[in-house]
Amino acid sequence: MLAVSSRRVLPGFTLSLGTSLLFVCLILLLPLSALVMQLSQMSWAQYWDVVTNPQVVAAYKVTLLAAFVASIFNGVFGLLMAWILTRYRFPGRTLLDALMDLPFALPTAVAGLTLASLFSVNGFYGQFLAQFDIKVTYTWLGIAVAMAFTSIPFVVRTVQPVLEELGPEYEEAAQTLGATRLQSFRKVVLPELSPALIAGVALSFTRSLGEFGAVIFIAGNIAWKTEVTSLMIFVRLQEFDYPAASAIASVILAASLLLLFSINTLQSRFGRRVVGH
């Protein structure tokens, strides 16, 4: 009996596994271990004093509020942009699709400088919003704008492949059975999109938690008002207070990991429920 040799795209299992583990150790575990080593230099009382400092707590609140608003905005308009790019054909569609990746390619400092110019009192958007007594620069709203700009591609690029795979024929079939467009979207499209949409919003939120370059230009560094956690960490590093910087960072890291774990659990349960039906 002839032995059938299986062809693999990657080299041998041992080499592939070893390379993967090396990558995980160097890129993921090593930075985390450095963070833990810095935290080990602090007692629990010192750690608690740092993370519960009133100014640090205020930075947590501003960061979480702005990231939440930005992620909700991205969830709505990211879904809308993915829908337009997938369901419609129009002149300039390819250019618009390419522009969706601009926040990834644009340096965050350049993005922050551009947003600060547009939303300043004399800027194009700033002058318009001033008529409604809305100020964006040097407020938490400016932080949310910067976060939304830098993280909206996560939603668009997560939802877009699912929409392309789903196709419009499912909506058309629902409409031929008497469903309205809203009903077909809510009962046919949205259940299929929900896992990808939730994942995109979660990625947008976690990305926003660590935003620094764009935020500093549009919101500045006003104590108790526009300070974000990434800026607090930077200030502690400038003071060579590495344990305190690590303590502040550990709270955001824990929040991000908890969110990602919750989203993965929710997605798996949602997937099992859909398959069960």
UniProtKB/Swiss-Prot annotation:
Question: What is the topology of this protein in the membrane according to its UniProt annotation?
Answer: Multi-pass membrane protein
Cellular component terms per the entry's GO annotation: plasma membrane
Does Transport show up as a keyword for this record?
yes
Q: Name one GO molecular function term.
A: ABC-type sulfate transporter activity
The record places domain ABC transmembrane type-1 at 60-263
Which InterPro entries did the record assign? CysT_permease, MetI-like, MetI-like_sf, Sulph_transpt2
Q: What is its main location?
A: membrane
Transmembrane stretches, by residue range?
17-37, 64-84, 99-119, 136-156, 188-205, 215-235, 243-263
What SUPFAM superfamilies has UniProt attached to this entry? MetI-like
Coiled-coil residue spans: none
Subcellular location field: Cell inner membrane
Which superkingdom, per the lineage?
Bacteria
Which Pfam families does the entry link to? BPD_transp_1 (PF00528)
- Gene3D superfamilies xrefs: MetI-like
Q: Which family does it belong to?
A: Belongs to the binding-protein-dependent transport system permease family. CysTW subfamily.
Give the protein's biological function: Part of the ABC transporter complex CysAWTP (TC 3.A.1.6.1) involved in sulfate/thiosulfate import. Probably responsible for the translocation of the substrate across the membrane.
State whether it acts alone or in a complex, and with which partners, per the record. Answer: The complex is composed of two ATP-binding proteins (CysA), two transmembrane proteins (CysT and CysW) and a solute-binding protein (CysP).
What is the protein name given in its UniProt record? Answer: Sulfate transport system permease protein CysT
**Which species is the source of this protein?**
Salmonella typhimurium (strain LT2 / SGSC1412 / ATCC 700720)
